[in-house]
């Protein structure tokens, strides 16, 4: 009986550990919780305040599809999406709007 309880506890702790690691890996990849089909509406809002809508949408959609995340608002807040924030051009400038 005691072995059964230990085995179940070990199984539960292992499962909990694997779920935690999975969440950390996802956060390291960008914290993306969006589905690719949600990118269009998120980027439409993100680019709604710019006068350069076409390039903004192009790069926002590219970034969203890679990172599965778009920062909230029309400007800034990139710290909420590390992948989106850290993707740079060859010149070192931000790739994502």
Curated annotation (Swiss-Prot):
Main location: secreted
GO-annotated cellular components: extracellular region; plasmodesma
Location of this chain's protein in the cell: Secreted; Secreted, Cell wall; Secreted, Extracellular space, Extracellular matrix
Post-translational modification: Six disulfide bonds may be present.
Pfam family, one: GASA
GO terms of biological process kind: gibberellic acid mediated signaling pathway; heat acclimation; response to heat; response to salicylic acid
Expression (tissue specificity): Expressed in roots, root hairs, vasculature of cotyledons and hypocotyls, shoot apex, leaf veins, stems, flower receptacles, pollen, filaments, anthers and siliques.
Phenotype on disruption: Early flowering.
UniProt signal peptide: 1-27
Keyword Disulfide bond appears in the UniProt entry: yes
Superkingdom to which the source organism belongs: Eukaryota
InterPro entries the UniProt entry points to: GASA (IPR003854)
Reported induction: Down-regulated by gibberellin.
Keyword terms of this UniProt record: Cell wall, Disulfide bond, Extracellular matrix, Gibberellin signaling pathway, Secreted, Signal
Function comment: Gibberellin-regulated protein that acts as a negative regulator of gibberellin-induced flowering and stem growth. May inhibit flowering and inflorescence growth via a pathway involving GAI and by enhancing FLC expression and repressing FT and LFY. Acts as a negative regulator in thermotolerance by resogulating both salicylic acid (SA) signaling and heat shock-protein accumulation.
PANTHER family, A to Z: EXTENSIN, PROLINE-RICH PROTEIN, GIBBERELLIN-REGULATED PROTEIN 5
Family label: Belongs to the GASA family.
Name of the protein in question: Gibberellin-regulated protein 5
């Amino acid at each position: 009986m005691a072995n059964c309880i230990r085995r179940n506890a070990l199984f539960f702790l292992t499962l909990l550990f694997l779920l935690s690691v999975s969440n950390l890996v996802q956060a390291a990849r960008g914290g993306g919780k969006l589905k690719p089909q949600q990118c269009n509406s998120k980027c439409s809002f993100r680019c709604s305040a710019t006068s350069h809508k076409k390039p903004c949408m192009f790069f926002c959609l590219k970034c969203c599809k890679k990172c599965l995340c778009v920062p909230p608002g029309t400007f800034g807040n990139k710290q909420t999406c590390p992948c989106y924030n850290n993707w740079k051009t060859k010149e070192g400038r931000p790739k994502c709007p």
